[in-house]
Amino acid sequence: MHDTTALSRPTAKDYTPADNPRFTKLHRRFPTVVDLRKHAPRHAPRFAFEYLDGGAGSDGGIARNWNALDAIELVPRYGVTTVLPSVGIDVFGKHYAAPLGVAPMGGPSIVWPGADRYLAAACQRINVPYALGLVGGMTVEDAAKVAPDVLWFQLYRCWRDEHAIGFDLVRRAQAVGVHVLVLTVDVPVRTTRTREVKAGITSPFRPDLRMIASILASPGYLSALWKHGQPRLGNLQPYTKDSADANEVAAFVRREMGGAFTWDEIARYRERWQRPLVIKGILHPADAEKCVALGADLAFAGKAFLWGLAALGAEGPGHVLDIMIDEMRSAFGQIGAQQPADARSVLVRHPGALQF
């Protein structure tokens, strides 16, 4: 009898880690993202690791998130697939190699100089979404040259002068072919991140002897800094005076940005943006349930890619994507999911779920 449940092999456009000749060698040393995290403080300066690894306050939120995710149990299902499944998906009319992408991040070049370029290049090579953050270190114009097929762009609320800067950024993104605009609604104020403050990441930024010594003790970081220069908020530089240094641009950002988008403001951005629009920051359980019911198609990660950068430099983002895609294919095979959409029907046990 013909087995209609068997899955055909991945199509030519579906990337797998086997396509990367460096994967096997890197995988021996760093088989998981956790291994990259352990190695990161040995390879990058201390202040860079504290900046990327910490959270708000005492890191209690990070611990709760880890515990909640670790408590999820996926019940295996066998006799469904005969090969490792393809994890390719179609989102907003585009095909991607996996249902994951690089989240928009602020200041990744503090973690590793040139970070935005390395992140964008890895996403373009592997074919997964790359969301450039407004306060990243690369302009949307430059990002479009590095990652023309996978570029998304994230905005915070630039409210002054009737959103003049925000609307101009939308114009710039549209002009260079950004595929998806992301509006962040879950950062109405900036919280205190204790570990980065103690490590010297403050505004205005004044590096001390301890930070300089840490850079000198990290030759890979020093080489990247020499090549790419100090971090800059490239997307916002055009709206400041030509002679503005990094601290002056940071002060400008604090004046221009703030608060969360209102729904009326989102509607105004929607009128100006003719392509897919994503609202980032859904936190309420009822809202999350609605998203799942409507069919959430992909997830974004941030810290994992920063751990990869801190541990491996330029090779880090690509190796993190390889790890995730490799693990995802194995997990889908174990739970009998022949494609990402099938994962929604898998039996899930979650005894550690937060109750509201």
Which functions belong to the PLM regions below?
Residues 100-103, 130-132, 151-155, 181, ...:
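Hydrophobic faces of well-ordered beta-strands that scaffold small-molecule active sites
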Residues 45, 162, 312-313:
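Glycine-centered helix-coil hinge/cap
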Residues 96-135:
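Glycine-rich active-site/cofactor-binding loop and its immediate structural neighborhood
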Residues 65, 309-328:
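C-terminal helical cap(s) of enzyme catalytic domains, especially alpha/beta-barrels
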Residues 2-93, 201-261, 343, 348-356:
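An N-cap/entry alpha-helix motif that binds or orients negatively charged groups
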Residues 124-166:
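A gly/proline- and charged-residue-enriched helix-loop-helix capping module
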Residues 107, 120-121, 145-146, 160-307:
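Alpha/beta enzyme core
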Residues 324-341:
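N-terminal pre-core extensions flanking Radical SAM catalytic domains
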